Amino acid sequence: MNTIEVIIDLRPKEPWDGILIAQLSELGFDGFLETRQGICAYAEEGLNVEEALKQTCLYEGGFEFEVHQKLIPAQNWNAQWEADFEPVYVDDRLSIMAPFHDLSKAKGLLIQIQPQMSFGTGHHQTTWLMSRALINMSQMPDRVLDMGSGTGVLAIIAEKRGAKEILAIDIEEGATENARSNAELNKCSKITALQGDIDLLKDEKPFGLILANINKNVLKAHMSEYARLLEPGGTLLLSGFFESDVDELVDFATKFGLQFVDVNTNETWAMIQLKK
């Protein structure tokens, strides 16, 4: 299927780029790139782009913007990503790069991600926050769950840091296939990537670490299951929401016996760490 590319230039860019990505992700767009001027958003052909944009912050005022869109034939999708995909560095301890980059410039742990439509290349603030948290963990638990795994980058980092069994789940078939390919690219053998939702976890034994980089509403809907699946003393890392949502999520999590440990932010985005 052909893909619609919507190029949105913003003046100023921040914090509106992150807000737009969050809003458009709930309006039919399933791929994003940050550019120097704003963002590129991608959706399947047939989406009413004009109607979707009317439901975002674009028309609330306070900043200037320009919107351009074009149709990308399906066979050109990867070429488009390759043209825009740049390496991501996390505190000089982690490099997220594509195979076509100059890998000799990697700093710290090198993770290779073949850019496709799946979310999670490290460019978005939430993926960066989660990646940083994994790099900074003193000891990686044996069993890790990655919900909304996208490209599989977090699952791959977890294995490279010592996890012995990682379950990566995403609702999108394309994301699951991408995660499997990226696991193979990084010579990972301990990752099981499955397509589905929280229902797949009914018979799973507890995890020492659960990662969930989705959005606030889904996180709240899944919270009881995260609490059930987390072993005593285990860690839950949540992201995919704004700094303004932190108190709401922390208060909600305490209802299920989860204790607040820490919060980290990047621009307007946040990640919270909880323990059972």
Model-derived features with residue positions:
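N-terminal auxiliary segments of SAM/dcSAM-dependent transferases
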Residues: N2-K105
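Conserved beta-strand segments that form the floor/walls of ligand-binding pockets within enzyme
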Residues: E5, S95, L110-Q114, L129, ...
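SAM-dependent Rossmann-like transferase core, predominantly class I methyltransferases
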Residues: N76-M140
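Conserved SAM/SAH cofactor-binding pocket of Class I
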Residues: M117, T121-K202, P206
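S-adenosylmethionine
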Residues: R132, I171-K276
